[in-house]
Amino acid sequence: MTNSNRIKLTWISFLSYALTGALVIVTGMVMGNIADYFHLPVSNMSNTFTFLNAGILISIFLNAWLMEIVPLKTQLRFGFILMILAVAGLMLSHSLALFSAAMFVLGLVSGITMSIGTFLITQLYEGRQRGSRLLFTDSFFSMAGMVFPMVAAFLLARSIEWYWVYACIGLVYLAIFILTFGCEFPALGKHAQHSQAPAAKEKWGIGVLFLAVAALCYILGQLGFISWVPEYAKGLGMSLNDAGALVSDFWMSYMFGMWAFSFILRFFDLQRILTVLAGMATVLMYLFITGTQAHMPWFILTLGFFSSAIYTSIITLGSQQTKVASPKLVNFILTCGTIGTMLTFVVTGPIVAYSGPQAALLTANGLYAVVFVMCFALGFVSRHRQHSASAAH
């Protein structure tokens, strides 16, 4: 593979995460405007965004098999057509049913693109470099989560209709579409060139189960925590601005942490540093929940920094449980993480209703403790060291 081809594929991976980050995180910015557009209360409107998450979940799950049937380049180009149709549907329709369908299609497109992006990085890079590259790729999710809410605020403040925000997000996919030209993708399944000797199917091992549970608990814990921090802070008497600043501080330090750890991870055994980071994140979250108001900004800043590498390290370790990175295995762990996203309000909503926001934060803290236990247990069964050693020879 030529270096320019590798660079193009890497940029497609970066932009695939930016696309999903933009679609997921911009929701809160435009929800009120969309509710006004359809003359509905915001609480009713939030339910329709479940179609976006459902689309992401279904596409990540199905793409483990689709990748072996439909070439990656074809998927990305067809996704561009679907993106245009979905954005056109948002612009031209006043029907809530068509809005929900367009959101579902956007979810499908971003889920397929993100699973392809993750797979490309696991194919292009080996060992510790794979972990640092995946982490840098994941930082584009956070970066888009910072940039596109600002774009949305800029457009909405000038009374420009909300659907133009989605047209702007579509420009990210336009860049992906352009990059597919003159670019060779790894072939999979029936499209791959098979050697004379059939490849032996590798068993995943129990380590993959530990990582799948860790992925689900981590995402559910993280989103359950950050979703209820503003309500918890307001309950302590903090202003709305100060409560919002806690969330901004978390994501800002999370992004800086990703950049820092994309360099740091190269020098450590991934399972060991993951266990340390999961343990530190669990302690820091507990200190945030039980600490004084004066210390809360410091605890959430350090929590964001030290938890930033956890999810990507889980995916990287998963890809290293087999000698050859398996798209089904990577997509299985991604699917578990996405299930965590889907369950966020299903799990935390009733807890808040019965026991208040602090109980939801303590539940999230318990989920982080489960992540720590899973990562610690993985140390006894992980195959990443033997596969890294054999790749080095």
Curated annotation (Swiss-Prot):
Show the GO cellular component annotation of the record. Answer: plasma membrane
User: Which keywords does this chain's UniProt record carry?
Assistant: Cell inner membrane, Cell membrane, Membrane, Transmembrane, Transmembrane helix
**Membrane-topology descriptor:** Multi-pass membrane protein
Coiled-coil ranges (or none): none
Where are its TM segments located?
11-31, 51-71, 78-98, 101-121, 134-154, 162-182, 206-226, 245-265, 273-293, 298-318, 332-352, 361-381
**Xref: Pfam families:** MFS_1 (PF07690)
- Annotated localization: Cell inner membrane
The answer to keyword Repressor applying to this record is no
PROSITE patterns, per database record = MFS
* Main location as per UniProt: membrane
Q: Which GO terms describe its molecular function?
A: transmembrane transporter activity
Q: What Gene3D superfamilies has UniProt attached to this entry?
A: MFS general substrate transporter like domains
What family is reported? Answer: Belongs to the major facilitator superfamily. TsgA family.
Instruction: Quote the protein name from its UniProt record.
Output: Protein TsgA
Which species? Salmonella arizonae (strain ATCC BAA-731 / CDC346-86 / RSK2980)
